[in-house]
Amino acid sequence: MNESVAKKTQETLGKVIKKPPLTEKLLSKPPFRYLHDIFSEVIRTTGFMKGLYVEAEMKSDNVKDKDSKIAFLQKAIDVVMLVSGEPLAAKPARIVAGHEPEKTNELLQVIAKCCLNKLSSDEAVKRVLAGDKLDQKGKPSTSRSQDKENREGREHHRDREERKGIKESSGSREQKDPDQPKDQESKRDDKDRRRDAERSDKGRERERTKDRDRDKDKSRDREKDKTREKEREREKDRNREKERERDKDRDKKKERESHKDRERDKDREREKRREKEKDKERPRETEEKLKDRGDRKIKAAEEISKSKPQPEVASRTHQAETEEAESPSRIPRPSSAKGQRRKPKTGGQGTEQDETESEGEAEGPSAEKPIPLENGDVTDPAALQTTHSRRLPRPSSARPAAPRVKRQESYTDATPAERLGSGKTPASVILDGKKLSEDEDDEDGQFVVEEAAPPPSDVPEVESNSLELQGDDKHGGLVKKILETKKDYESSPSSKSKEQDRSLVSEASRKKERELVAREIERLRSSIQTVCRSALPLGKIMDYIQEDMDSMQNELQSWRKENKENAQALLQEQRITDGVVEPLKVELAELEQLIKDQQDKICAVKSNILKNEEKIQKMVSSISFSSQT
């Protein structure tokens, strides 16, 4: 396509519309959507062709089929031809296919002229909507009857000319042959009458055929109008159905979104309820855990305390036996004696027993329970108090009591000398982590016996032995276990309080963490909602950007190609000019050389002239001198 055609359309149509860019690329091969945008913009700005298209046709999305595109363009072409009166060679099928860009540009130019001249298109729009069609020459051709009428008119004109010629010939013959007989004239008149009758019959038949053709054409036009109206109604129904489907889809989408929002709200409410229930259940669980731990520790302490009293009872029985041995009136108890010995509280021994009882009470609530002995007897604290006043006989089946270590205070008490002979050697000291051997278990009567009035030299030895026993007693296995359980039991309430404090601190910190996490989740939700809201417009923008980018890239490529072509053409022109200028440059150099040569010659001639003038002056002076002389 020539660039002049595109420039002409840009000049003419650019005065009418501004919106769709009238680029050479688009005008060289205009797509249908581009033409649709141009027509809609012309209708919007100038009002030309207003009322020609329905609202559905004004949207390019509804005009996608080939037939609808052809009908759209045909309407515009018919209106433009009726308004302008100029014939247009543009065919809508070729325009839709992308061919004949020059003819489409001519159509656009004619539209621009009509808009600039402010020609009204109301009558043309009405005629086109009524169904009037135009031929390529610009004349309305509603039916074939018009062509027939034209043909018949031509035939009438020919018949008239023939009649005139016959009359002229007859007149000339009359003038030439005045002497012819009247019979010939009558014959001619008969012939003329016959011819006239035949012609009139033919004319009547022609008129009848014309009327029939007109009726047929009218019926055809009516049928065409009916079919067009039916098609329009169908198109309207289709458009209405499409709009209804779109409305239904929109309603469904809205319902889905509302349903989703409701489900989200319900899920949030459920999560909040669950969190509240969890928050309510957590302090209960912590309290139950603390109670379980306390119960477990109490049970463990009770079990330990149940296992403790056996050595204490044995030590008490052994102490009672030693006290009996100290008194001068008592006889050493044989190993086969049954029952238990109990000594009343007297002096330092009573204080020792009080100390042991206080230790038992400090160890826990298990001290108040009945204490089981090794032989299966059970002793209560009330029974222990009664044994101070009344002693039960020791059973023969009882196991021998463990050796009781005498404290240093007891050595100061006076003991009778009568027990020295009957007293046995002191029991061997229990080592760390070792139990009594079988030999020691077999010995029934190993008790600690003290002298009534030991000599002063023997006192330090007894004291050293008691100190060793005390040191060894600290490292005894049973005593060690008792002390450990006692320490554990004493430390258990403090540990419970610490654990409670820790649990309270941990719960407070957890609540703070939950609040922080909830705030962060709310922030994330709000940010996600904003992102989702901005996603749809962003997607639409991206779609439009993609279309614009494609067109811009194509335009850029075309401009680059044009730039390259222009650069190449410029280089070629420069080469051509250089080739043309080179001989001129040579000629110029030659001319300059000739000018220099001529200047040199002129200078030489001037010098000769000056020399000749000098010679002439000399000659004149010599002549004048000679004449004077």
Swiss-Prot record:
Residues 352-362 have a biased composition (Acidic residues). Keywords: Cell projection, Cilium biogenesis/degradation, Coiled coil, Cytoplasm, Cytoskeleton. This is TRAF3-interacting protein 1. GO terms for biological process: camera-type eye development; cerebellum development; cerebrospinal fluid circulation; cilium assembly; intraciliary transport; photoreceptor cell outer segment organization; pronephros development; regulation of microtubule cytoskeleton organization. Residues 130-511 are annotated as: Disordered. Belongs to the TRAF3IP1 family. GO terms for molecular function: microtubule binding. Residues 145-306, 471-511 have a biased composition (Basic and acidic residues). GO terms for cellular component: axoneme; ciliary basal body; extracellular region; intraciliary transport particle B. Component of the IFT complex B, at least composed of ift20, ift22, ift25, ift27, ift46, ift52, traf3ip1/ift54, ift57, ift74, ift80, ift81, and ift88. Interacts with ift88. Interacts with il13ra1. Binds to microtubules, traf3 and disc1. Interacts with map4. It is found in: Cytoplasm, Cytoskeleton; Cell projection, Cilium; Cytoplasm, Cytoskeleton, Cilium axoneme; Cytoplasm, Cytoskeleton, Cilium basal body. Residues 220-282, 511-602 form a coiled coil. Plays an inhibitory role on IL13 signaling by binding to IL13RA1 and recruits TRAF3 and DISC1 to the microtubules. Involved in the regulation of microtubule cytoskeleton organization. Is a negative regulator of microtubule stability, acting through the control of MAP4 levels. Involved in ciliogenesis. Its main location: cytoplasm. Residues 394-403 have a biased composition (Low complexity). The lineage of its organism: Eukaryota, Metazoa, Chordata, Craniata, Vertebrata. The gene is traf3ip1.
